[in-house]
């Protein structure tokens, strides 16, 4: 319950003052993202700061699709240390650009983290009208060891217009 007395740190004009920054460390500086090339923006997807990654994804929505696809593939191929999460980020950026990349989708289906595989199943359902054989991808997902991946595959199969999807 809330105390009935007024706290001494109350601001008479704006109400309570809440601390929204961590004490003992400086504020993060907002990076200047405008004016960066597409390749530089894609590289910024590796940032540990969630706000920066979110702003980068918003800026990448306005980039030419061909340039975006080339930059994403160059980013994935340049670093041998690309992890599961980076593959997920790459596919999500290409999905927001409405660019179907079946090879990257298949690559995400093989990652260790079940969340990446579940996302790949969801994307396979969304792209079912544009993939060569979406049901083959969903069959892989239905046989996955994790229940969330199997569930996403079933939901994705419901998006398919193919009568074989019911099997």
Spans of features found by a protein language model:
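Residue-level detector of extended alpha-helical repeat arrays and alpha-solenoid scaffolds
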Residues: 52-53, 84-87, 117, 150, ...
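Short inter-helical turns and helix N-cap capping residues of alpha-solenoid HEAT/ARM repeat scaffolds
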Residues: 48-49, 80-83, 112-113, 145-146, ...
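Conserved hydrophobic register position within alpha-solenoid helical repeats
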Residues: 55-57, 87-90, 120, 153
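Repeat-solenoid scaffold signature
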Residues: 1-6, 136-167
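Beta-propeller domains with acidic blade repeats across secreted/periplasmic ectodomains
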Residues: 1-40, 61
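Long hydrophobic segments that form regular secondary structure
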Residues: 37-87
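Amphipathic alpha-helical scaffolding segments comprising HEAT/armadillo-like alpha-solenoid repeats
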Residues: 33-42, 65-77, 98-110, 129-143, ...
